[in-house]
Amino acid sequence: MEEKITYKNAGVDTEKGREFIQKIKRNVESTHGPRVIGGLGGFAGAYDVSVLKKYKHPILLSGTDGVGTKIELARLLKIYNTIGIDLVAMCVNDILVCGGEPFFFLDYIACGKLDPEKMDQIVSGIVQGCKMSNASLLGGETAEHPGTMKEDEFDLAGFVVGAVEKDSMIDGSTIRSGDKILGLESSGPHSNGFSLIRKLLLKEGKYLPTDPQQVKFLKDYALKPTRIYVSSILKLLQQVSVKGMVHITGGGYQENIPRILPQGTQSKFFKEKIPSGYFFEKIKKDHKIEELELFATFNMGIGYMVIVSEENAELAKKIMESSGEVVHEIGEIVSGNKEEVQFV
């Protein structure tokens, strides 16, 4: 008997997709507050923006990002419950740079074949990240791509929307020579530099090492989720005038810091004040990579930076430390070419 031609035979199991939605529904809806209208599964996510009435002149902020090739490391290690946190962190930390409070988050997951257990773990991480950011997981899409992705392959993208008061929006325009740079410690490489990490630490750049200690190092240090700085920074902004902020992501110091500096200013860092931590010290020790290349690739132990006037530096540091952050005064602003970064 001739086999029936169906969508399922072509590689897309819509019934399994519906079951997956039911499986994650309660978890996703645990991020919903009174602003979310309706539940999961509709054509659109609905969010009550009457909250904007508390703003004199609200500015909406949006951001989108992924987790890069850190996903490949998670796939090899079969650990899926942390990269969802990474996904949220990469987005919310970006709009936070402008002083933005996240409102809601959306996710997109593409996979070769839907594995409900694996996807449930990924979504659980996204839910955890949303709770840490006080953002609602308003909706998402999980798409099977049979024939174009291998069955165990997947990729993630995240999208966040938030708001900031226009007069409170932080754009770096008031930064001046003499201002201090405070660095908030990272948890490790966060979600950047993983193409280099895989080249250095995986066999042929794509297989797990055979040494169990090296595998443990990858699990314990490389795969640690990206820190979410939302609550600490929003608390700081209520009490201290902040001139500029930087989320250290792809391109490290050299690519990210110039993005918020006015012309005629330059960042100067004191290397001995930057707590690179075990992961980066091991990379530096075990592999012949120039230090400047490391700073141009990784966060080197500092995931987020806050620029304040000299007189506000100590107070800002204390406030962030009271929120549980580990903070270091790692540099200052000097006169010079904003595109160049000094390390002394």
From Swiss-Prot:
InterPro entries found in the cross-reference section: PurM-like_C_dom (IPR010918), PurM-like_C_sf (IPR036676), PurM-like_N (IPR016188), PurM-like_N_sf (IPR036921), PurM_cligase (IPR004733)
Enzyme type, top EC level: ligase
Highest rank taxon of the organism: Bacteria
Keyword Nucleotide-binding: yes
Chief localisation class: cytoplasm
GO MF, one annotated term: phosphoribosylamine-glycine ligase activity
Keyword set includes Protein transport: no
CDD domains recorded: PurM (cd02196)
UniProt entry keywords in alphabetical sequence: ATP-binding, Cytoplasm, Ligase, Nucleotide-binding, Purine biosynthesis
Enzyme Commission number, as recorded: 6.3.3.1
Subcellular localization, as worded in the UniProt entry: Cytoplasm
GO CC, one annotated term: cytosol
Biological process annotations from GO: 'de novo' IMP biosynthetic process; adenine biosynthetic process
HAMAP family per UniProt: AIRS
Family recorded in the similarity comment: Belongs to the AIR synthase family.
NCBIfam families: purM
Name this protein carries in UniProt: Phosphoribosylformylglycinamidine cyclo-ligase
Designated gene of the protein: purM
